[in-house]
Amino acid sequence: MKRPCEDSTSDSDMDETIDVGSENNYSGQSNGSFIRCGSPTTTSQVMARKKRRGIIEKRRRDRINNSLSELRRLVPTAFEKQGSAKLEKAEILQMTVDHLKMLQATGGKGYFDAHSLAMDFLSIGFRECLTEVARYLSSVEGLDSSDPLRVRLVSHLSSCASQREAAAMTTSIAHHQQALHPHHWAAALHPIPAAFLQQSGLPSSESSSGRLSEAPQRGAALFSHSDSALRAPSTGSVAPCVPPLSTSLLSLSATVHAAAAAAAAQTFPLSFPAGFPLFSPSVTASSVASSTVSSSVSTSTTSQQSSGSSSKPYRPWGTEVGAF
C-alpha cells in the first residue's frame, strides 16, 4: 500500500523538477510575461499613449485637408478646375506656388482688392459655365465640335466672356481711381463750417438737436422753393404752420441741403455773390418775403398760392443739387 504512494510522490516530484527546469530554461519569457501581467498601470499608459498619438495624427490630417480645401477655393486656377476633375494635393500646392509667384511678379496689384477679386471670380464662373455648356452639347445633345449650332453658340459665349472681362478691367480701373480720390464723397460727411453757416443765416451750434430745431425758422425760407415740390399742400398756411412731422422733415431737408451745398462748394469752387453760395441775394430776399407774406395772409390767399404753385412744373430737389 505504501509503494503506490511512494510512486505517486516520486512522479509528482519528477513533475515538479521538470517544471522548475522549464522555468529555468525559459526564464526570460517567464519574467517578461510576469512583468506584463503583473503591471496593469504600465499597460494602461501604453494604450493611452497610443490613443493620444492616433488622435493627434487625425487632427493633423484634418488640418492639412482643411488647408488644402481652402487653397483650392482661394486660388483662381484651382477653383476653375475643381468642377471638372478632382485635384490632387500636389496639384493644389503647385497651383498655389504658381499663384504666389505671379503675385510676387506683378506686385500683388488688384488681387487684394475686394472689387477686383469679385470680378475675377465672376469671369472664372462664366468660363466654367461655358465649359459646362460645351460638355452638355457634346454628351447629352450629341453635337460634335463641327456642328454649326454648337460652333455658333460657343463662339457667342466666348465673345461675351471676352467682353465681360474687358468691361471688368475698365470697371476696376475706374474703381481704383475713385478709391484714390475719396474726398468727393467725404465732403458731404464733414461738419458744416461756422463761417458758411453765418453767411447763409443758419445756426452755428454744434449740437444736432439745436441745429434741427432752429433750422426750419431760418433755413426753411431759403429752400421753400425747392421743398414746395416735396410737400403736399395743406389747408392752413404753407411754411410755419405745418404739423410737427413736417417740421422735422423740413429741418432734415434744410440740413441735407446745407450739407449738399457745402459739398458742391468744396468740390466746385465757383465765385458766387455774398450770402448763400447757390442763390443770389435777390432770390433769397424774395423767398424770405414770400414766406413771411404767406404766413400772414388769409386762407383764400393760401389757396391761390397753392394753386399757383401746383401749376408750376415738377422740379425735384435732386435736379437742383445735381445741376451744380
From Swiss-Prot:
Residue spans of biased composition, Low complexity class: 294-311
CDD domains, alphabetized: bHLH-O_HEY2 (cd18920)
Positions with biased composition (Acidic residues): 8-18
InterPro entries cross-referenced by the UniProt entry: bHLH_dom, HES_HEY, HLH_DNA-bd_sf, Orange_dom
SUPFAM superfamilies for this protein: HLH, helix-loop-helix DNA-binding domain, Orange domain-like
Positions with biased composition (Polar residues): 22-34
Entry-linked Pfam families: Hairy_orange, HLH
Membrane-spanning segments: none
GO cellular component, one term: nucleus
Residue interval(s) of motif YRPW motif: 314-317
GO molecular function: protein dimerization activity; RNA polymerase II cis-regulatory region sequence-specific DNA binding
GO biological process: artery development; artery morphogenesis; blood vessel development; blood vessel morphogenesis; cardiac muscle cell proliferation; circulatory system development; dorsal aorta morphogenesis; heart development
Compartments (UniProt record): Nucleus
Region (Disordered): 1-34, 294-324
Function of the protein: Transcriptional repressor. Downstream effector of Notch signaling which regulates cell fate choice in angioblasts. Represses the venous cell fate, thereby promoting the arterial cell fate and aorta formation.
Family: Belongs to the HEY family.
Record-given protein name: Hairy/enhancer-of-split related with YRPW motif protein 2
Origin species: Danio rerio (Zebrafish)
